[in-house]
């Protein structure tokens, strides 16, 4: 009995331990009462207060550069080539219903690349602005990481 009580107490402590990950709630059409698909995202950080971002669709001239700022801090990271066409994004979903959430966490410091000019937040929103499908978003984001190096250690 004591072993079960101790194990249960340890589990409860672990369950409520302080973490710095974000939260996603995803409900598929077969799990909702009316067949709706529901996606919710929260940046569970004390410094991020859940703004609803909007990036309007646009067409750009060839050679246009995009300033990249770190999503968490607003720190300028560098410039990348802008796509010729971008799509409307509100929150974490674009006009084609491509939706991206994240649940990041602390990572190993030796994996950080101080020369990187893209962070996870920029990847999310650039991926959404440039993609019509989830597969396309994944390709765009992985190509950007390969070309520019990811500045964060955990994502």
Locations of the language-model features?
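A contiguous strand-loop segment
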Residues: 22-119, 140-154
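N-terminal secretory signal peptides that target proteins for export/translocation
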Residues: 1-2
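Second-shell loop/turn segments in exported
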Residues: 113, 122-131
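Sec-dependent N-terminal signal peptides
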Residues: 5-15
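Short, charged, surface-exposed loops that flank catalytic or proteolytic processing sites
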Residues: 130-138
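Sec/Tat signal peptide C-region and signal peptidase I cleavage site
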Residues: 16-21
